[in-house]
C-alpha cells in the first residue's frame, strides 16, 4: 500500500512539473478596425484662373469712350494679318499727337463725318482708297496736326508715305501723295479751312469745315498765360487742376456737340 502511495505521489509531481513547463498560450490579438474606403474618389477642383482686369492709364475717361472708326486695310488682307475690318481708336490718335485737345478731337470728327458721306449705309471705308486735300501748308497753324490724325485713319499720306513698291500695280497700296498740302500758306482763318476728301474708286467728293471758335470753355489771354506757367512747372496744384479741367473740357465739347448746326459743315461735291 505504501509503495502504491509513493508511485501515485511521483506521478502527481511529474504531472505538475510538465504542466508548469508547458508554454503559455499565445494571446489572441483583436482584429484591427476596418478602414473605410470611400466608394467615390474625392474630386479635386483646380482653381479657375482669374483674368486680370484691364487697367487704363488714362485719367480722362472720354479718351477711351470715343467710338472707333472701322476701316478695311488691304495690306492686312494680302499679308494674312486680319480676317476683316479693323477698329481705329481715338486713344491711338492721341498717342500719335502726344495729347488730346479740341484740335485732335476736331480732326477725328472731320474724318468721321467725311467717311460717313463717302461710304454710306454702313459700308466700311477702305484705307488707300481716299485722297485728301489739306487747307493749307503742313507747317501752317495746326494743319499738319490735323493731317497726321487724318492720315492715321485713312492711310492717305504726303510725299513721305509708302510708294507701294511692287504692290503699286494696284493703286490701293500706294499711300504716297494721297494727302496733299498747299505749297504756300493760305492764311485762311481756321473756321474757313475746308478739308476735301475724295473716294478714288467712285469719284465721290466731300468737304468738311470745323468751326472751332464755338468750343467752350473759350480760350483767353489769361488761359494762355496759365498754359505757360503749366509748361514751366510754375503753376500751383490748384492752378494746374483748373487748367487740366479747362483743357479736357474743350475736347469733350467737340465730341458731345459734333452734330450742332454750324459746328461741322459738310458739303457734298458732285
Describe these PLM feature segments.
Residues 15-20:
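C-terminal motif of bacterial Sec signal peptides marking the signal peptidase cleavage site
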Residues 28-50:
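Post-signal peptide N-terminal segment of mature Sec-exported envelope proteins
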Residues 1-5:
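Positively charged n-region of N-terminal signal peptides that target proteins for export
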Residues 22-24:
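Bacterial signal peptide processing site
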Residues 45-98, 109-270:
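Non-transmembrane, aqueous-exposed alpha-helical and coiled segments at domain scale
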Residues 6-13:
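Sec-dependent N-terminal signal peptides
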Amino acid at each position: 500500500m505504501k509503495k502504491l502511495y509513493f508511485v501515485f505521489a511521483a506521478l502527481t509531481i511529474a504531472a505538475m512539473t510538465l504542466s508548469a513547463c508547458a508554454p503559455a498560450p499565445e494571446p489572441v490579438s483583436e482584429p484591427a478596425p476596418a478602414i473605410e474606403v470611400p466608394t467615390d474618389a474625392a474630386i479635386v477642383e483646380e482653381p479657375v484662373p482669374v483674368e486680370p482686369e484691364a487697367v487704363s492709364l488714362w485719367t480722362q475717361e472720354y479718351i477711351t469712350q470715343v467710338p472707333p472708326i472701322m476701316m478695311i486695310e488691304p495690306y492686312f488682307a494680302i499679308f494674312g494679318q486680319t480676317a476683316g475690318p479693323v477698329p481705329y481708336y481715338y486713344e491711338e490718335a492721341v498717342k500719335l499727337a502726344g495729347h488730346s485737345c479740341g484740335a485732335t478731337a476736331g480732326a477725328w470728327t472731320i474724318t468721321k463725318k467725311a467717311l460717313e458721306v463717302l461710304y454710306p449705309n454702313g459700308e466700311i471705308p477702305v484705307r488707300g482708297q481716299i485722297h485728301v486735300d489739306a487747307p493749307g501748308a503742313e507747317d501752317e497753324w495746326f494743319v499738319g496736326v490735323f493731317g497726321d490724325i487724318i492720315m492715321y485713319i485713312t492711310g492717305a499720306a504726303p510725299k513721305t508715305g509708302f510708294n507701294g513698291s511692287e504692290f503699286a500695280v494696284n493703286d490701293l497700296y500706294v499711300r504716297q501723295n494721297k494727302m496733299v498740302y498747299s505749297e504756300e500758306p493760305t492764311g485762311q482763318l481756321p473756321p474757313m479751312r475746308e478739308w476735301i476728301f475724295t473716294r478714288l474708286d467712285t469719284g465721290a467728293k466731300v468737304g468738311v469745315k470745323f468751326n472751332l471758335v464755338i468750343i467752350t470753355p473759350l480760350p483767353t489771354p489769361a488761359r494762355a498765360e496759365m498754359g505757360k506757367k503749366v509748361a514751366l512747372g510754375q503753376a500751383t496744384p490748384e492752378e494746374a487742376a483748373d487748367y487740366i479741367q479747362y483743357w479736357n473740357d474743350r475736347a469733350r465739347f467737340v465730341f458731345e456737340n459734333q452734330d450742332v448746326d454750324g459746328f461741322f459743315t459738310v458739303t457734298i461735291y458732285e
